[in-house]
Amino acid sequence: DDVFRAGRNGSESFPAILESHTPLDLIIIMLGTNDCKTVYGATAGIIGKGVETLLEQVKKYSPDSDILLISPIYLGENVYKEGFDVEFSKESIQVSKNLEAVYEKIALKNNIHFLRAQDFVSCSETDQEHLDAQAHKIFADAVYKKTDEILKARFIKAAC
């Protein structure tokens, strides 16, 4: 839970969102960067447990959906420094890098699709944590290709 901003725990509203949008062919989950903030003191493993909670909710409320888990980009090396985002620390950078291995294991364990954002883009130099406009376009293209692949396979399987 975000101690500074109420209503930021997505797992509380996620079941209602899933139920109200069923049936869903594909659910995409990409989160974890904000969980790297110093205030939470979370490791990549702890953040991964949160992802697993969401996956359990998907399996309960939308069991026929395909799932794509995306590991987020790494935080920039200067993100914690003055002029950037002091809610992060030097340790936060390593936690953000560790997320991809944790998420990949979760994807394999749960037999779901996986994509690494860092394979396509990295954070902007401007703020050391978000994508710039060009990176958004590149990443959107990568996600489109992956979702197209998943949905084509899904529809071929359904037609058989």
Set out the residue ranges of the language-model regions:
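Short acidic/His/Gly/Ser-rich catalytic and metal-binding motifs that mark active-site loops
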Residues: 37-38, 76-81, 122-125
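Alpha-helical structural signal in soluble globular domains
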Residues: 53, 57, 61, 102-110, ...
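Conserved beta-strand termini and adjacent loop/short-helix elements that scaffold enzyme active sites
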Residues: 70, 117-120
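Carbohydrate-associated surface elements
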Residues: 73
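Substrate-gating cap/lid alpha-helix
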Residues: 76-116
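Histidine-centered active-site loop/cap adjacent to the catalytic His
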Residues: 113, 127-160
